[in-house]
Amino acid sequence: MGNASSIVQTINVTGDGNVFKPSAETSSTAVPSLSLSPGMLNPGGVPWIAIGDETSVTSPGALRRMTSKDIPETAIINTDNSSGAVPSESALVPYNDEPLVVVTEHAIANFTKAEMALEFNREFLDKLRVLSVSPKYSDLLTYVDCYVGVSARQALNNFQKQVPVITPTRQTMYVDSIQAALKALEKWEIDLRVAQTLLPTNVPIGEVSCPMQSVVKLLDDQLPDDSLIRRYPKEAAVALAKRNGGIQWMDVSEGTVMNEAVNAVAASALAPSASAPPLEEKSKLTEQAMDLVTAAEPEIIASLVPVPAPVFAIPPKPADYNVRTLKIDEATWLRMIPKTMNTPFQIQVTDNTGTSWHMNLRGGTRVVNLDQIAPMRFVLDLGGKSYKETSWDPNGKKVGFIVFQSKIPFELWTAASQIGQATVVNYVQLYAEDSSFTAQSIIATTSLAYNYEPEQLNKTDPEMNYYLLAAFIDSAAISTSNMTQPDVWDALLTMSPLSAGEVTVKGAVVSEVIPADLVGSYTPESLNASLPNDAARCMIDRASKIAEAIKIDDDAGPDEYSPNSVPIQGQLAISQLETGYGVRIFNPKGILSKIASRAMQAFIGDPSTIITQAAPVLSDKNNWIALAQGVKTSLRTKSLSAGVKTAVSKLSSSESIQSWTQGFLDKVSTHFPAPKPDCPQSGDSGDGSARRLKRDSYAGVVKRGYTR
């Protein structure tokens, strides 16, 4: 395999003295978390310059934007650019007259961090002759004295010295050079990660070890033949050592082993202490919990005053229904011909091509009342259903969506003459095969879709009703005795809102919502039948974020109090003292604590409990408001501590992983043994380095034919 020369040492990858001793304090890290979002990088403003020395900058038109042509005359006086305004690498950059932009300190710090990330792979980049000169963002910056602002009016009161500026061309070329290097590193980075995960190279706590020669042999035996590590083993060794302080190579010339890792700061934050989880983990989890609570907007979801529907609404999410199983009195957006109407009747409708279709209506037929629906996409899937009868096989039959309009309510229809107009808006042909059960024919997955938009129906008559039906249709008349199904709603109907900002409450479109009034106002049946954009679903979605935040932060068990459950306890303590009706029950604090804890645990398991009337505690809006506000306070007042149970559990779990890892590495050393130092091979002259080369017949990746 040979020697590799790096800046600090000469190494022998397959030789003696190398160390493989991963520990929690030297865990691998190479991920540069860059903050390059536009909101962080911009706006830094632009530089402005006075038009003339005699002109007051407060005069109209006294400032103009600086361009690259202004740099020489302004930068000569700046000590940072004493050699001239043009940076040392500017010969490589076109020097055109371009407007300048101000670079924020945040941008400089993050681009510098990106440069550092590339240097993890410097030896490999040099081998490829890619980015032979380490990029330096500061070389492309010029520091000038100027007025700074997005507008001239803002800039005239903001004169600054030594402001970093850059032209768009230089900025683009710099980013392109970084991107080109990252492109060249794509497979290299993957292969390095494969090598680091083929066997455990990190441990969550403590320390593990294995002879490095055994590790190298395992990698040689298992790495893919096209792995770049086989082609560039020396460069890979250096790159791995920079990432992981547990991988150390002996300096052959000095006879010393040094930790080459550059991640000591990050690794220490990732390591647990003897009694607490890693600092980074605690910080991240607290941040996640706070982000969830912020997204839930506790003030909005606990409001006792009306909130505009667009403010309360969430991004629309699809909801699934089986229309045949919904109660008509709960799903107020449905209509049904009474089952007592015993005489089926045939109707004939057309589609947008003028083709005529026949269908039947009968008692029990259901439709969607489009007048109570916001713009919506309907997708009906009959997959897995049978619909077979003695004289009716669904295979090859067609099902369609039909839109009706009539001034007569649907539930009063008894004849085709009562229908104003109707059209087939879409249809599909079914494929079905005989089931394993007798007399059943299973329909394959279907996708009968329709996008409902009110504007398409030209709703000008306020007395006109609009309905959507899913049913079998045929080009010939369908015998009412052969096909007895009232419709084909016994399927999976997915409804997806096409517009955001519209909210319904139990089927009625509303302009505003009082969130606190939603608490405990739905039965499980009415919640199940609610539309996708129902206020209850919006409330549950927001409440789910609160529940997830509690789960991240809280490790209290059943009946145990916690900072997140005691807000409910406080509310219960006061409410039992309030004057009311019936027998008053006074619970001691121990009982109240358990009641509050159970209510919180039920909420974590199913956030919809705040909406349904079945939840005895959180269906009270006062208890819900206390919880929502209390969780926010609990997280805001938390430091970087962790729950007692969480700390103990994670530490004991980490110790079990440490034991497993060491056991695995012991097996590696057993099955891929390192040469014994006291067994020189014939011809050994006694020189350490010569003995190392001769006795290692396996020689790591050298056996694959690579040059030492």
From Swiss-Prot:
<keyword id="KW-1045">Host mitochondrion</keyword>
<feature type="glycosylation site" description="N-linked (GlcNAc...) asparagine; by host">
    <location>
        <position position="482"/>
    </location>
</feature>
<keyword id="KW-1032">Host cell membrane</keyword>
<feature type="glycosylation site" description="N-linked (GlcNAc...) asparagine; by host">
    <location>
        <position position="3"/>
    </location>
</feature>
<feature type="glycosylation site" description="N-linked (GlcNAc...) asparagine; by host">
    <location>
        <position position="528"/>
    </location>
</feature>
<keyword id="KW-1043">Host membrane</keyword>
<feature type="lipid moiety-binding region" description="N-myristoyl glycine; by host">
    <location>
        <position position="2"/>
    </location>
</feature>
<keyword id="KW-0053">Apoptosis</keyword>
<protein>
    <recommendedName>
        <fullName>Outer capsid protein mu-1</fullName>
    </recommendedName>
</protein>
<feature type="glycosylation site" description="N-linked (GlcNAc...) asparagine; by host">
    <location>
        <position position="12"/>
    </location>
</feature>
<dbReference type="GO" id="GO:0020002">
    <property type="term" value="C:host cell plasma membrane"/>
</dbReference>
<feature type="glycosylation site" description="N-linked (GlcNAc...) asparagine; by host">
    <location>
        <position position="110"/>
    </location>
</feature>
<keyword id="KW-0472">Membrane</keyword>
<dbReference type="InterPro" id="IPR036256">
    <property type="entry name" value="Mu1/VP4_sf"/>
</dbReference>
<keyword id="KW-1173">Viral penetration via permeabilization of host membrane</keyword>
<keyword id="KW-0167">Capsid protein</keyword>
<dbReference type="InterPro" id="IPR015961">
    <property type="entry name" value="Mu1_membr_pen_domI"/>
</dbReference>
<keyword id="KW-0519">Myristate</keyword>
<dbReference type="InterPro" id="IPR015960">
    <property type="entry name" value="Mu1_membr_pen_domIV"/>
</dbReference>
<dbReference type="InterPro" id="IPR015962">
    <property type="entry name" value="Mu1_membr_pen_domII"/>
</dbReference>
<comment type="similarity">
    <text>Belongs to the orthoreovirus mu-1 protein family.</text>
</comment>
<dbReference type="GO" id="GO:0016020">
    <property type="term" value="C:membrane"/>
</dbReference>
<keyword id="KW-1152">Outer capsid protein</keyword>
<dbReference type="GO" id="GO:0140267">
    <property type="term" value="P:symbiont entry into host cell via permeabilization of host membrane"/>
</dbReference>
<keyword id="KW-0946">Virion</keyword>
<feature type="region of interest" description="Disordered">
    <location>
        <begin position="671"/>
        <end position="708"/>
    </location>
</feature>
<dbReference type="InterPro" id="IPR044937">
    <property type="entry name" value="Mu1_membr_pen_domIII"/>
</dbReference>
<feature type="glycosylation site" description="N-linked (GlcNAc...) asparagine; by host">
    <location>
        <position position="458"/>
    </location>
</feature>
<comment type="function">
    <text>Major outer capsid protein involved in host cell membrane penetration. In the endocytic compartment, outer-capsid protein sigma-3 is removed by cathepsin proteases, which exposes the viral membrane-penetration protein mu-1. Both myristoylated peptides mu-1N and phi are released during infectious subvirion particles (ISVP) formation in the endosome. They associate with host membranes and mu-1N induces permeabilization and delivery of transcriptionally active viral particles into the host cell cytoplasm. Seems to induce apoptosis in the host cell.</text>
</comment>
<keyword id="KW-0449">Lipoprotein</keyword>
<keyword id="KW-1038">Host endoplasmic reticulum</keyword>
<comment type="function">
    <text>The viral outer shell polypeptides, of which mu-1 is one, impose structural constraints that prevent elongation of nascent transcripts by the RNA-dependent RNA polymerase lambda-3.</text>
</comment>
<dbReference type="InterPro" id="IPR009113">
    <property type="entry name" value="Mu1/VP4"/>
</dbReference>
<feature type="glycosylation site" description="N-linked (GlcNAc...) asparagine; by host">
    <location>
        <position position="81"/>
    </location>
</feature>
<dbReference type="GO" id="GO:0046812">
    <property type="term" value="F:host cell surface binding"/>
</dbReference>
<keyword id="KW-0325">Glycoprotein</keyword>
<feature type="site" description="Cleavage">
    <location>
        <begin position="42"/>
        <end position="43"/>
    </location>
</feature>
<dbReference type="GO" id="GO:0039624">
    <property type="term" value="C:viral outer capsid"/>
</dbReference>
<dbReference type="Pfam" id="PF05993">
    <property type="entry name" value="Reovirus_M2"/>
</dbReference>
<keyword id="KW-1160">Virus entry into host cell</keyword>
<dbReference type="GO" id="GO:0033650">
    <property type="term" value="C:host cell mitochondrion"/>
</dbReference>
<keyword id="KW-1162">Viral penetration into host cytoplasm</keyword>
